């Protein structure tokens, strides 16, 4: 809970993107209390990361004033964290508790010196220093450092301690950086998409950790359950303005709905006034020219008002493929392993014809391998995979290899044609692309400069135009804003076929999933009919309420 001590203020802060006239932040006035938990939300490109960099002191190119109260430490988790490539995972994580590490090293060196010959004065000095070090280590509970590091690394599913940083994937680097930052325990935590690349168990641990965190937490995230469970304040960046709300995400949604209704009423009233004034101006006789000028001035004033631009109404169009029969995909006693690691064994499930199956589990558990087995890119070690005769698969993976960075968005979809064929129908190519939130100049962007979220939407548009009736979507919500996720939810709910979706976004899964396929460790995969929340309740009843870190089952003990 915040203690009402203001530690940070923004006074009239604004920012314009370099080499353009686009204003992303304008006249923002904010104050943060110590201990506050704040979630920052907004569309992609609304200035969330820019605001975080200004708060962190990394971006000085802004208008206005930023004031920190003295004596508070700040830690920032960037989307692409920096770390020494020549270090091991453990060495990087230890940087978060470097002072304690140094104390323990010196304490060990002091103890070794007792074996060396020395006079009484040197001995007394050594004993005194040993006492000082003991007191300092006691104060920071340094004797428990090894177990503390182990718990933190396990909770965030970090790579092995001795793994080299240069071999880590982007997701692994993010988890290592988050672990290092949390161990530092700064007064203010700035977290840019902290749940990206975390499995569900790690997200739940992080939520509990941040709820109990004594300092201030400011997080940019599209994870709506995270915002509901952690945030006590929501800061919405909307058309350059910062709009604070005291409450979690659910309460923010309610007031946002009311605010949009009010905006629509005000805009409707303004338009009606404009229409009345314009009608009077057009019909006024010359004899009333003086009064007409006054009315014309009123009209022009209304016209010049900055009408509040509505948020774009996003839509992701998922065309229905050919009619899907009753038999979709069936796994019968399927097993799969890599080397001595068994991913799953005796896996049995049947995909429902009109269902949406959410696939959950830690990174590296075998979720993407499951998709590759369905696609036929890999073969099972045992068992059978049966695909129905009417099935037409459409696979949206995370690699996006089919996207040429030197082509524009429009060229990628249209392929030198003005039309896109959807089954027996032809639709205007630009209209089709616009239904995935690429409109106007965005269609002429080169694919090589697209953001992660834009590449996700483009790959979705590219794959879906083939009109599959069974969709395999691998992490479709990564790097996209909440509005785009909502549009995807609506698109999937209106899709007539079957969809299988790998995701760590619990709110998204609760909205769309009719079934859950959960990788639960030790080669076990559990198929459950119901929503994500219903599965979680079922899991707790079966396995208990305590988190259980995922373990691979070895083929040979």
Report residues per predicted region:
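ABC ATP-binding cassette signature C-motif
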Residues: 1-268, 312, 319-557
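Intracellular alpha-helical coupling/juxtamembrane segments of multi-pass membrane proteins
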Residues: 255-288, 292-298, 302-309
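Alpha-helical coupling/stalk and coiled-coil linker elements that connect catalytic or binding modules
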Residues: 277-286, 300, 314-321, 327-330
């Amino acid at each position: 809970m915040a203690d009402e001590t203001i530690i940070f203020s923004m006074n009239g802060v604004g920012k314009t993107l370099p080499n353009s006239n686009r204003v992303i932040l304008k006249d923002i006035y904010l104050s943060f209390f110590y201990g506050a938990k704040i979630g920052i939300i907004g569309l992609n490109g609304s200035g969330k990361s820019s605001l975080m960099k200004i708060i962190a002191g990394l971006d000085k190119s802004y208008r206005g004033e930023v004031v920190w109260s003295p004596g508070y430490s700040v830690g920032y988790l960037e989307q692409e964290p920096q770390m020494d490539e020549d270090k091991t995972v453990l060495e990087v994580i230890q940087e978060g508790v470097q002072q304690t590490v140094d104390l323990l090293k010196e304490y060990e060196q002091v103890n070794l010196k007792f074996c060396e010959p020395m006079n009484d004065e040197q001995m007394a000095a050594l004993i005194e220093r040993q006492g000082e070090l003991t007191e300092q280590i006691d104060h920071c509970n340094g004797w428990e450092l090894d177990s503390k590091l182990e718990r933190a690394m396990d909770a965030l599913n970090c790579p092995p301690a001795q793994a080299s940083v240069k071999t880590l994937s982007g997701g692994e680097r993010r988890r290592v950086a988050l672990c290092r930052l949390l161990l530092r325990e700064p007064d203010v935590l700035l977290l840019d998409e902290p749940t990206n690349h975390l499995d569900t168990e790690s997200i739940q641990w992080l939520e509990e950790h941040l709820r109990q965190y004594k300092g201030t937490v400011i997080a940019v995230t599209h994870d709506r359950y995270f915002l509901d469970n952690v945030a006590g304040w929501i800061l919405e960046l909307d058309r350059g303005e910062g709009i604070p709300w005291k409450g979690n995400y659910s309460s923010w949604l309610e007031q946002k709905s009311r605010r949009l209704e009010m905006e629509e009423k005000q805009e409707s009233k303004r338009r009606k006034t404009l229409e009345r004034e314009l009608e009077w101006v057009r019909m006024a006789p010359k004899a009333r020219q003086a009064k007409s000028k006054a009315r014309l001035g009123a009209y022009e004033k209304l016209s010049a008002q900055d009408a509040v631009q509505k948020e774009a109404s996003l839509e992701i169009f998922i065309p229905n493929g050919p009619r899907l029969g009753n038999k979709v995909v069936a796994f019968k006693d399927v097993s799969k392993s890599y080397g001595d690691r068994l991913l799953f064994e005796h896996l049995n499930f049947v995909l429902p014809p009109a269902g949406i199956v959410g696939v959950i589990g830690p990174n590296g558990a075998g979720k993407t391998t499951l998709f590759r087995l369905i696609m036929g890119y890999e073969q099972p070690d045992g068992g059978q995979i049966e695909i129905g005769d009417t099935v037409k698969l459409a696979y949206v993976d995370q690699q996006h290899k089919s996207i040429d960075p030197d082509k524009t968005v429009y060229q990628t979809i249209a392929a030198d044609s003005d039309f896109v064929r959807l089954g027996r129908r032809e639709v205007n190519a630009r209209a089709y692309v616009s239904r995935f939130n690429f409109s106007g100049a965005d269609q002429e962007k080169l694919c090589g400069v697209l953001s992660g979220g834009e590449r996700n939407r483009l790959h979705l548009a590219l794959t879906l135009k083939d009109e599959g009736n069974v969709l395999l979507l691998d992490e479709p919500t990564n790097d996209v804003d909440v509005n785009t996720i909502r549009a995807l939810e609506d698109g999937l709910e209106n899709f007539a076929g079957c969809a299988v979706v790998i995701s760590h976004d619990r709110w998204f899964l609760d909205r769309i999933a009719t079934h859950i396929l959960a990788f639960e460790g030790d080669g076990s995969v559990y198929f459950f009919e119901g929503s994500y929340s219903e599965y979680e309740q079922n899991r707790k009843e079966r396995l208990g309420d305590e988190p259980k870190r995922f373990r691979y089952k070895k083929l040979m003990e």
